[in-house]
Amino acid sequence: FECVIYDGTTDGSAISDADCAALVWKCKPSGIRDVGTSSAYTPGADGLNHLVHFTRPTVVPVYATFAVVQNSADGVVNPLIDLRDAVLAFARDKYNVGTDVVWSSLFRPAFVRGIYDITDLFIGTAPSPSGTANIIIDDHSIAVFDSSRITVT
């Protein structure tokens, strides 16, 4: 039994190890051994402290570069920011621990009002991406998008 706990930060600082252990202990099946790369003690109903294991995922930063053609007739003030925000919202909803970043899936949220066409889309795990291949995320990692890593021109 392994819990992979992502707290929304790159260093795991939002939720303490003790709080993670308490959460795992609360929902852990009885008699099933827990495993993981991190651990902490938490009190049980028996009054004893129990060592609980869990894993924090490796954060994989995702960089994306969109080249677009705008449609000024739509009257949208800043469709480039709207596109970036739509991709971020999509990523927050879609990408969990172990979920691959599928290159073609990023076209869907990118078509916001004011965008006529997407002429190029590149993704990668380093600045200035040039790839169109999917980003494979293993079971102990999570793809994380950030507005500072999405470029729209």
Each language-model region and where it sits:
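An aromatic-glycine-centered, glycine-rich loop/turn in mixed alpha/beta architecture
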Residues: 75-153
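Carbohydrate-recognition loop of C-type lectin domains
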Residues: 1-99
